[in-house]
């Protein structure tokens, strides 16, 4: 939800969203259009995000038709070049989504998002619907494209090992609240929020000797309904270190170390 609000697929009910120095929450219509081209999304499900009645050329070309006025030849060249960047060739152009595997469909979805040369890309769990054997290939491709095209990613994921691999900076959310923000290496080395510590302790470790040295943090308590949150800290019902003041007021993000923020009273 936060990511989709950031690219204005959802309207926000409060606060500001700044792209560079412009608050895009105040923009509509033609004023917002240039920013929409600079922000794109790679959807989670490659099976439902592609129109089954459009072939690959139409799917990748549609964003170009909406955002740029290109001649037929230049349009075709842009589509072919983008298709090659995601590891597919021109033989796919006349085919339809049902003729491809899940990994190939996601590559088409990535090409569709990047063909207009955006600057900011929301990757909404782009590998969670893919076979495990393909996930690493897609992530490595996304990293290569990031370097080649100068992209900024907001990568939404629940796979903590994959998050560690692809991220430079991580924000941890609990029930819609950001509880910790940190450079990736520092977060995995020294997590500060109790929820982050519990998450990282749950990562499977293939080495049995090392696994025995890790203390798993099992959370108790009930997960509150997002529509009926408790007073104070959103994590208070499950936190093993909860104090009376945690129920009275929610802690705000504070800087615990350079670039490392945490919303906790501890």
Predicted feature residues:
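Charged, flexible cofactor/metal-binding loops and thiol motifs
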Residues: 90, 183-265
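Conserved ABC transporter NBD signature motif
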Residues: 15-23
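A short, proline-enriched helix->beta-strand linker immediately N-terminal to the Walker B motif
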Residues: 115-119
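Conserved ABC ATPase "signature" region
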Residues: 22-23, 73-91, 200-201
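P-loop NTP-binding/switch modules centered on Walker-like glycine-rich loops
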Residues: 126, 130, 134-212
